[in-house]
């Protein structure tokens, strides 16, 4: 299995993504943002960071990069695309996922571990998690507040397109770290092949760091190929 990790100027989670994919047994290769051909890859990973310095809006300039034309074709063919943090922002700016990621309600960059509940486990990314499991995953963003108009929110909820939702790790009342509507932490496309999420599963895959809650996310992709 061979995945492309897109490197945008300002991205800083590309090495984390490579480590996580390779730990799961997936061959990972870096692809520069000027690339126009993604043939030969089984999946595409858009990593976190600050692409183009977050000028205009987070992900706005990266969404216009040449590689995104290839990513769009890749997604339209039904192949897997994952965007984490800035990658999620890029997917919404490119129109590959609905909604937008706005500034956190506290107007601060927030970096901590949060509770993330698995809403669906019938996708390659989540099939190794029990539905309803609350994961402990890191976040690190200043613009992670998911927003969509009421009609879009109703469609996301009605069609089961919300995959991850912020949830209490213990009994804390302020578990939503950024003010995302409906506590949304991650969504998927109607075809189920394009996933965007703000928490970082790739930063929770190693026992040395004391947390492997993100590893099944990547192992599920391997299991999908083996089916």
From Swiss-Prot:
Keywords: ATP-binding, Cytoplasm, Glutamine amidotransferase, Hydrolase, Ligase, Nucleotide-binding, Purine biosynthesis. GO terms for molecular function: ATP binding; glutaminase activity; phosphoribosylformylglycinamidine synthase activity. One of its GO terms (cellular component) is cytoplasm. Residues 2-227 form the Glutamine amidotransferase type-1 domain. It catalyses: N(2)-formyl-N(1)-(5-phospho-beta-D-ribosyl)glycinamide + L-glutamine + ATP + H2O = 2-formamido-N(1)-(5-O-phospho-beta-D-ribosyl)acetamidine + L-glutamate + ADP + phosphate + H(+); L-glutamine + H2O = L-glutamate + NH4(+). Pfam families: GATase_5. The active site is at residues 85, 200, 202. Pathway: Purine metabolism; IMP biosynthesis via de novo pathway; 5-amino-1-(5-phospho-D-ribosyl)imidazole from N(2)-formyl-N(1)-(5-phospho-D-ribosyl)glycinamide: step 1/2. One of its GO terms (biological process) is 'de novo' IMP biosynthetic process. The keyword ATP-binding applies. CDD domains: GATase1_FGAR_AT. Its EC number is 6.3.5.3, 3.5.1.2. It is found in: Cytoplasm. The keyword tRNA processing does not apply. Part of the phosphoribosylformylglycinamidine synthase complex involved in the purines biosynthetic pathway. Catalyzes the ATP-dependent conversion of formylglycinamide ribonucleotide (FGAR) and glutamine to yield formylglycinamidine ribonucleotide (FGAM) and glutamate. The FGAM synthase complex is composed of three subunits. PurQ produces an ammonia molecule by converting glutamine to glutamate. PurL transfers the ammonia molecule to FGAR to form FGAM in an ATP-dependent manner. Part of the FGAM synthase complex composed of 1 PurL, 1 PurQ and 2 PurS subunits. This is Phosphoribosylformylglycinamidine synthase subunit PurQ.
């Amino acid at each position: 299995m061979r995945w492309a990790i897109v490197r945008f100027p300002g991205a800083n989670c590309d090495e984390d993504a490579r480590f996580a994919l390779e730990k799961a047994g997936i061959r990972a290769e870096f692809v520069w943002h000027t690339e126009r051909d993604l043939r030969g890859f089984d999946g595409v990973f858009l990593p976190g960071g600050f692409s183009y310095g977050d000028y205009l809006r987070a992900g706005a300039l990266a969404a216009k990069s040449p590689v995104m034309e290839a990513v769009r074709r890749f997604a339209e063919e039904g192949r897997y695309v994952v965007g984490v943090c800035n990658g999620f922002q890029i997917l919404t700016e490119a129109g590959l996922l609905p909604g937008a990621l706005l500034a956190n309600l506290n107007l601060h960059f927030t970096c901590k571990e949060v509770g993330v509940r698995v809403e669906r486990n019938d996708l390659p990314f989540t099939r190794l998690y029990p539905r309803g499991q609350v994961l402990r995953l890191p976040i690190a963003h200043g613009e992670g507040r998911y927003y969509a108009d009421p009609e879009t929110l109703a469609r996301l909820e009605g069609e089961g397109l919300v995959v991850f939702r912020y949830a209490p790790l213990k009994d804390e009342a302020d578990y939503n770290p950024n003010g995302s509507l409906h506590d949304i932490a991650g969504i998927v496309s109607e075809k189920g092949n394009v996933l965007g999420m703000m928490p970082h599963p790739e930063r929770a895959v190693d026992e040395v760091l004391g947390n492997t809650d993100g590893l099944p996310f990547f192992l599920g992709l391997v299991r999908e190929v083996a089916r």
